[in-house]
């Protein structure tokens, strides 16, 4: 199955698993593959979200949440004066997919520690998006209000993290 933009999601999962490996050689190869994948945030960020939504391995989901947060956190400009944040290089459509799918991940995630990491990613994404233009994520505030009103204690916690 190919992820958005052409990543083979099974191969991408193997890269994430290799990042978790105790084998230094395997981990170094995975880090290099991830460095190359970062050149294409249009496919990388949706691939993180896809694994967050569909992968059964909690370690993979956890790592994807952390890597996604780091990807949207890297703000600033490169030496060439280009935006260095992966988020800044996404199309409006890809940004929308990432934003809406991340909110869905909060709802569907069953592991508390992973949900917290997803909330951290949403928080960082929110800081970046809302700093640029508050109207760019109109679903965020209604989602948070609904989560606080939910009868689900996990959603209360997620809204307040």
Which role does the model predict for each range below?
Residues 1-161:
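Karyopherin-beta/Importin-beta family HEAT-repeat alpha-solenoid scaffold
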């Amino acid at each position: 199955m190919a992820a958005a933009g052409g990543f083979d999601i099974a191969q991408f999962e193997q890269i994430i698993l290799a990042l978790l490996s105790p084998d230094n050689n395997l981990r170094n190869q995975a880090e290099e593959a991830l460095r190359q994948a970062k050149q294409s945030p249009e496919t990388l960020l949706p691939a993180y979200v896809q694994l967050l939504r569909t992968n059964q391995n909690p370690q993979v989901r956890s790592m994807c949440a952390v890597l996604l947060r780091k990807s949207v956190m890297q703000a600033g400009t490169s030496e060439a004066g280009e935006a260095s944040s992966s988020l800044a290089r996404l199309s409006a459509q890809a940004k929308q997919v990432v934003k809406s799918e991340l909110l869905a991940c909060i709802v569907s995630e069953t592991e508390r520690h992973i949900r917290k990491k997803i909330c951290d990613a949403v928080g960082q994404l929110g800081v970046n998006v809302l700093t640029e233009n508050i109207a760019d994520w109109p679903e965020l505030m209604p989602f948070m209000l609904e989560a606080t009103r939910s009868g689900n204690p996990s959603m209360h916690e997620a809204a307040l993290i």
